[in-house]
Curated annotation (Swiss-Prot):
CDD domains reported for this sequence: Ribosomal_L30
Pfam families: Ribosomal_L30 (PF00327)
GO molecular function: structural constituent of ribosome
Listed name of the protein: Large ribosomal subunit protein uL30
Gene3D superfamilies according to UniProt: Ribosomal protein L30, ferredoxin-like fold domain (3.30.1390.20)
InterPro entries: Ribo_uL30_ferredoxin-like_sf, Ribosomal_uL30_bac-type, Ribosomal_uL30_CS, Ribosomal_uL30_ferredoxin-like
Amino acid sequence: MAKTIKVTQVRSSIARLPKHKATLRGLGLRHIHHTVELIDTPAVRGMINQVSYMVKVEE
């Protein structure tokens, strides 16, 4: 079974760069306190690094 991580949006996407808003949508996050469980891949890790100031990650 693939390793998964939980990603929670903790800051608003209002007044953020359009690229960062698109990254949040790509991760499946829509609003504050929304949590999604994703497969831990290099692509997902890269997306998380880009918006790390808006999300919380749980292994």
